[in-house]
Amino acid sequence: ELLDEHSGLQTPKLWQADSVPEENWSDWLRIFKSFLRTKLVDVISPGFKSIHRLGALLPHECVTIQGLSFRSMQFHAIHRVDAYHEWLSACDWRPAYLWHERYLKILASENPGKRWLLKAPGHMLGISALRKQYPDAKFIQLHRRPSEVIPSMASLYASLRSGSSNKVDFEELGKSLVEEWRVGLTRVLELRGSDSMVDQDCLDIDYQEMTGDPLTVVEKITEFLELPLVPDPRFKMREYLLRNRKGKHGSH
């Protein structure tokens, strides 16, 4: 969300990912339908907004667009589907990124000239297919302690699953997340280790640095992307940080 304040970057918004663009759908209707979906999440999973900000006009992770090709971490996040989860770790991700690129091209036709800023944990699983589909992509890899990542993700998954089930198996959840992230990180490290060009296109950011001094990290990222950080985006980012202090909607 902070990087989305930069005038040279654009992100898929939730309302854009929620509804495939159609000629007979006006934007306001798609935005309203997406807004209603966020309110439904508030009802069935009341604690979710303290874990992850969700809004029709906010930047949205790629999990929803990936889901249109039936390759997305979101399905196992919301429901316990062990067979699908096992398949997802071994499937061919190329169809997901072929569709993903087509989708972004449609969105970009309404706002051309800006660079896409994308985010989703599932990109780790399909990192090789992503690289082939987007050979000029730059990667920002965030490094955080596994002892913090897994409980955080488990909390998010448990909140989502509680909306559709009266029982959440936390032991299963923890084990599946550890395996999911092990597979994803292994693929990222193997690709970076086997292709020096990919490694050069990666910027490593420490999570503690990001939370402690976000504007300095933003400057590193914009320099890495060769984007100017002029006064206006910097001011907008400071305003964003003041409006959205950590813990504003609770903690988990």
Kindly label every feature range from the protein language model:
Residues 11-116:
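PAPS-dependent sulfation machinery
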Residues 4-12:
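Post-Walker A helix-loop "phosphate-sensing" segment adjacent to the P-loop in P-loop NTPases
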